[in-house]
Design a protein with these regions (language model features):
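N-terminal accessory targeting/assembly segments
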Residues: 1-110, 416-418
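C-terminal-of-GTPase-core extension/linker across diverse P-loop GTPases
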Residues: 1-12, 23, 32, 131, ...
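Flexible beta-alpha connector loops of hexameric P-loop NTPases
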Residues: 17-23, 53-57, 115-120, 159-160, ...
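Conserved C-terminal guanine-recognition region of P-loop GTPase G domains, centered on the G4
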Residues: 28-37, 68-73, 84-99, 244-246, ...
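Short, acidic/turn-prone active-site loops that include or flank metal/cofactor-
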Residues: 105-109, 228-229, 338-341
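Short alpha-helix plus adjacent loop in nuclease-associated cores
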Residues: 106-128
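Switch I (effector-binding) loop of TRAFAC-class P-loop GTPase G-domains
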Residues: 186, 191-198, 216-248, 256-269, ...
């Protein structure tokens, strides 16, 4: 998509059977946000009801003609469908429209490509793009491959498609190796962070203000520009919790309704940061429409990833946009504002308690000259009692598994327990 020119696009919303908790109108509004985030200019849109999806076009023949006519009238350069089109459907629609046909996945990929900043992020986007292109490549060359089968009847089109397939699959192999190397480095970095103390991951629906809240919690003066999928690469900063305890706070990629599985897989490195965290802060935009549906989308995604059982806190961000005296729309959520700082101290306290949910108690006897280790206990755990006896320091407290592993040499087996 030509992002710099504000390419005019026509959007097609669809009311399909079994679409889920989002209404077609809401989903179309979100598609419009995605298009604008990709640098496009929405010149028009329509909402179609599809009782029985057409295998050839997804929509009915008459509906397709109406879409093509309206897109041409508005001089749209591309038509974007709020669904995942099959390669055959995309090709047939392009033939009728004589202009680009994109689906929801292609649009999200375009946004991802625009916002990927790190080498790892760019590699993951490139891999997802090739994975998306491969089945469409087959359909693109389908006419050439129908030149007949058998020896002596294979046409040049069949040779070309096989060559293109090989090149793309070879590129996938290269990308996979590069991503795996970066993934290994990130794994080492995670292990080092675990040694340093608590880790907390911010998750949430895209554009919920995760990056702004991350900056506010960590004292960063530049929260960045609010936009969909502003963060594709995990960002790690240090934050201080009540009592002087330190935590590493990780900003992660946002979720979205009907996020294609191939994109979830492409960003597994980002999601591994959530998996390794001691606690999760689920950030939601309290002023956004359909707040409950957005929260449910994130919770459902976490469940699919096997992360629903992690200790978590629900932070209802952008509370400064609520009317005075207006109560939280979701029970159990904490009202905060990254912009004004309201509620951040209470949130820090809740983060500390959530992260400590799986801590273990310890009772250790340290050498007298253990200043560095004591400081480590203070920053990444909690000290309940400290006594100096002769040339020894007796410490009772609690902490995360990484800290207790460090302290085992100073304790008898029964003195470290859950």
């Amino acid at each position: 998509m030509n992002r710099e020119s504000g390419e005019p696009v026509f959007l097609v919303g669809l009311e399909l059977p079994g679409r889920g908790i989002w209404t077609p109108k809401d989903s179309l509004a979100e598609l419009s946000e995605l298009a604008e985030s990709a640098g496009a200019r929405v010149c028009g849109q329509t909402l179609l009801r599809v009782r029985r999806p057409n295998p050839a076009l997804l929509i009915g023949t008459g509906q397709a003609e109406e879409v093509v006519t309206e897109a041409a009238r508005l001089r749209a350069q591309a038509i974007v469908f709020d669904a995942e089109l099959q390669p055959r459907q995309q090709r047939n629609l392009e033939r009728r429209a004589r202009r680009k046909i994109l689906d929801r996945t292609a649009l999200i990929l375009d946004v991802f490509a625009r916002h990927a900043g790190s080498a790892e992020g760019k590699l993951q986007v490139a891999r997802a793009q090739i994975d998306y292109l491969l089945p469409r490549l087959s359909d693109l060359w389908v006419q050439f491959s129908r030149t007949g089968g058998g020896i002596g009847t294979r046409g040049p089109g069949e040779t070309q498609i096989e060559r293109d397939r090989r090149e793309l699959r070879a590129r996938l192999s290269v990308l996979d190796r590069q991503i795996e190397r970066l993934r290994s480095r990130r794994s080492i970095a995670r292990a080092q962070r675990a040694e340093a103390g608590l880790t907390v991951a911010l998750v949430g629906y895209t554009n919920a203000g995760k990056t702004s809240l991350h900056a506010a919690l960590c004292g960063d003066a530049d929260p960045g520009e609010p936009r969909m999928f502003a963060t594709l690469d995990p960002k790690v900063r240090r934050a201080e919790l009540p009592g002087g305890q330190l935590a590493l706070v990780i900003d992660t990629v946002g979720f979205i309704n009907r996020l294609p599985p191939r994109l979830v897989a492409a960003f597994r490195a980002t999601l591994e940061e959530v998996e390794s965290a001691d606690a999760i802060v689920h950030v939601a935009d309290v002023s956004a429409p359909h707040l409950t549906e957005r929260v449910e989308t994130v919770v459902s995604t976490l469940e699919d990833l096997g992360l629903a059982d992690k200790p978590s806190v629900l932070a209802l961000n952008k509370a400064d946009r609520l009317r005075a005296g207006e109560s939280p729309p979701l029970p159990g959520g904490m009202l905060v504002s990254a912009r004004t700082g309201a509620g951040l101290d209470v949130l820090r306290d809740a983060i500390g308690k959530a992260a400590a949910a799986d801590w273990q108690q310890f009772d250790v006897e340290l050498p007298y000259r253990s200043g560095a280790l004591l400081e480590r206990i203070r920053s990444s755990g909690r000290i309940a009692r400290l006594r100096y006896v002769g040339d020894r320091v007796l410490v009772q407290g609690s902490g995360p598994p990484a800290l207790l592993n460090r302290l085992r040499r100073y304790a008898s087996p029964e003195s470290i327990h859950t």
